[in-house]
């Protein structure tokens, strides 16, 4: 019986040890699997974070470059517009300087020479030019055209004049502003080539 008890104790020990080893192996295996899953999850999250960070960096770089390009375009357009404005102002001043009393008188007479003699015409000048030219123009014009032409002051004119039929059907603008605008439009393509920054 002693051997049976001893065998029974040994068997219980062996079964307990086997069970403990099996449980330990199972715990170790589960721990390894959990560790591998945690590592895989961490690697996957790290990869996603890296991809997200790279995309954000790329987007930031792209947006920064686009903002820089837009700022440069705005600067070029602003500079071009400033230069155009200066050029247009200088052109207007240049045209205005030509419009002295003698030039205006000659130009008005030449414009009226090609106008129909039966038309009723209004000539509009600024007030200072009317004071300087009124008597000379009235004498020159009335000799050719009679009373069909009136000379009127017009506050909106700096230099130059406007001519229109009294019924308003035909109108010509010979003001320094209008002539400068026409010249600027004519010169603008050439001007653009000169200041082209490409």
From Swiss-Prot:
Keyword Ion transport: yes
HAMAP family to which the protein is assigned, alphabetical: ATP_synth_E_arch
Entry keyword Transport: yes
A GO molecular-function annotation: proton-transporting ATP synthase activity, rotational mechanism
Family: Belongs to the V-ATPase E subunit family.
Any one GO CC term of the record: proton-transporting two-sector ATPase complex, catalytic domain
Function: Produces ATP from ADP in the presence of a proton gradient across the membrane.
Protein name: V-type proton ATPase subunit E
Native source organism of the sequence: Borrelia recurrentis (strain A1)
Origin: domain of life: Bacteria
Keywords: ATP synthesis, Hydrogen ion transport, Ion transport, Transport
InterPro entries: ATPase_E_C, ATPase_V1_Esu
BP term (GO), one: proton motive force-driven plasma membrane ATP synthesis
Gene name, Swiss-Prot/TrEMBL: atpE
NCBIfam families on file: PRK01558.1
